[in-house]
Amino acid sequence: MKSLRFIVPCLLAGLSTFALAQTPAAKADASQRNANTPADATKTPAPKEKDWNAQYVLGPDSQEKANVPKGVVTKFHLDDSKTFPGYGRDWALYVPAQYDGKKEACLMVFQDGMGYIGPKGNWRVSTVFDNLIAEGKMPVTIALFINPGFAPDKNNPTGKGKDGKPLGKSNRSFEYDSVTDAYVKFLLEEMIPLVESKGYKISKDPKRRAIGGASSGGICAFNAAWWRPDAFSKVFTTIGSFTNIRGVNTNGKEVGGNQFPRMVMESPKKDIRIFSQDGSHDLTNQFGVWPEANQKMADAWKAKGYDYQFVMGEGTHDGRHGGMLLPEAMKWLWRDVR
C-alpha cells in the first residue's frame, strides 16, 4: 500500500504568518521604565507553540452509542513473571457482549494496556470494539490489556502509590524495545494461558490474533509478530519507536529497533499485516528520528510486498492521531475475519 500523508491547512498558521508581517512594537527605553516594573515586563510574549495534534478529533465510532451492547472490562494484577522474574504488572480483559463461550473469540493484545481502556482519553478501545462488533465491521474479539512490568517497592507490595501510579523500577524499555523474542514468549507462555485459565476460548489461528501499541509499545507489537507470525498476523503500531533505544548484541552485531528495515529487507516476507501511523513532528533525540525511522519501515514493507498502510500526519509524540485512526485501522486489519 502506498503511504498516506495528511496535510491539513491550518487557519492558525495563516494568522501566525500575518502576525509576523506586522511592524513590531517599539521597545521601551530603560530610562523611562518604572522602577517597580520588572526588567522583562515590556518584552513581547513568545508566540504560543502550535498544537499539531489539535486537528485530530475522535469520530462517531469512538463515542458510546445508544442500543449498542456493551462489553465488560475486568482488571487484574499479576504479582510476578517467569519470563521477567521480580516484575509484576496490572492487566485487564475486555470481553464483548456477543461472546457466548461457545465459539473461540479473536484476540487483540495492547501494550501499555491500561491507557487503552475506559470511555475517555485518546483510545477508548472498549467503546470502539463495542461499536464495530455490533455493526459487523470486526469479529467478536477479546482484548487483553497489559502494562509493562515493575518491581514494587517493599513498602508498597501492590506496586501502587496513593495517586494510583506504579511505584518501583519499570521494566518497560527492556520488555518493549529489545529486539528479541522474550516478550512474545511472555505473551504465549504466561498471559494468554492466564486468560484461558479463566474460561475464555481464544483462537490459535494467527489471522484471528492482533497486537498493538504506541511508541515503544508500537515497536513491541511489530517485534512480537516478527518473531512469531504463527501467533500474531495483525499489527497496529502508532508513533512506533523504531529507533536504537536498546541495542542487543547478537552474533557480534548490535541489533536495535533501527535495524528493523534492514531485517525486513533481508528476510523472507512474513505473513503479517500492518497498520502504522506517525507524525512529522514526532521525536528527534539521541536514539534517532522517529518520522524517518517509521518512513524507513514503511519503505521496507513496500519493497517486500507486505500488506500494510502507513499514515504520516503532522502530529507529535502523542496518541490523538492514532486514537482518531483506531476505528478505521481495526476495520482494515480485520477485514478478512468475521
Where are the predicted features?
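Positively charged n-region of N-terminal signal peptides that target proteins for export
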Residues: 1-6
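Bacterial N-terminal signal peptides
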Residues: 8-17
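Non-catalytic cap/lid and distal C-terminal segments of serine-dependent acyl enzymes
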Residues: 25-338
